[in-house]
């Protein structure tokens, strides 16, 4: 009988520690965050009152899958995983000067397309 009480005590302590850790995080910490749609959003750093600068921001498609054997045979350096992705890029833009002599792109339309600059 005393043997079962020890196990019950250990289980209760473990459960209470787990619940304490779980409740110490803000709401939604463990849930998947929604990824915003790819669209122009205001860049607060370059924008001025009355002259907003927009940059494309948001999420697009990406996936990884095992490299097909037929493709693997043609690779100089074989890799087991192949990945595909698209990035949120400007479909149309205008170049503007801000802060005197800094040229930036003011994005007017965005879409998901080939990633040219990869962020690490």
Swiss-Prot record:
SMART domains per record: GHA
One family name in Pfam for this protein: Hormone_6
GO biological process: follicle-stimulating hormone signaling pathway; G protein-coupled receptor signaling pathway; positive regulation of steroid biosynthetic process; regulation of signaling receptor activity; thyroid hormone generation
InterPro entries: Cystine-knot_cytokine (IPR029034), Glyco_hormone (IPR000476)
Keyword set, alphabetical order: Disulfide bond, Glycoprotein, Hormone, Secreted, Signal
Molecular function in Gene Ontology: follicle-stimulating hormone activity
Gene3D superfamilies: Cystine-knot cytokines (2.10.90.10)
Coiled coil spans: none
Covalent S-S links between cysteines: 35-59, 38-88, 56-110, 60-112, 87-115
N-terminal signal peptide: 1-24
Broad class of where this protein is predominantly found: secreted
Family: Belongs to the glycoprotein hormones subunit alpha family.
Function statement: Shared alpha chain of the active heterodimeric glycoprotein hormones thyrotropin/thyroid stimulating hormone/TSH, lutropin/luteinizing hormone/LH, follitropin/follicle stimulating hormone/FSH and choriogonadotropin/CG. These hormones bind specific receptors on target cells that in turn activate downstream signaling pathways.
Name this protein carries in UniProt: Glycoprotein hormones alpha chain
Organism of origin: Macaca fascicularis (Crab-eating macaque)
